[in-house]
């Protein structure tokens, strides 16, 4: 079964107001067996508009990723984030099929 990911691009406009959101997330993510794959870090934006923070959060599967986002706990916490940051967030299903390097040229 393919894993799933939240991919977020974040521009925090109120650091102090954002802190309670960040502090509440570990308990929520633990409940849904999520883990950070990317959490900030150095980045380059060769195309499109950049934001100052980028995150990728991994979930066991797509249904779990959606359930976490829709959970009452996250929805309550989301209001804090929305008041203190501009965010683009997508939920995507991963791919666990064959890779190009797995094919043998004939």
Language-model regions, residue ranges each:
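C-terminal structural segments of small proteins and small subunits
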Residues: 75-92
